[in-house]
């Protein structure tokens, strides 16, 4: 990998209530691209991944949030932490590096509307 390129894991969250998610590993991610550019890349790449079930390939993902950064503590939340949105939700106009993404970072890709609904009423179905 070239300098400035890292490996990150993207957790595709289909349902917060049912804890339905799939991790996808990306190698060679350029940290100098904007969050918006990375979202566009993910939206183009995910539907082409035949190893993902159709419900994950065809979902309306639109937001990214940091789940875990390498060598830092993890939360006890099974799908995604509902705290620290100001710091962990990625803003589209910043670069991945400025947003805090580094090698081995795990981020969530989800529908922001679903996240807000779940945050307002965090009940799991099982």
Curated annotation (Swiss-Prot):
Disulfide bonds: none annotated. Pfam families: DUF2340 (PF10209). Belongs to the UPF0538 family. PANTHER family: UPF0538 FAMILY MEMBER, UPF0538 PROTEIN C2ORF76. This is UPF0538 protein C2orf76. It comes from Homo sapiens (Human).
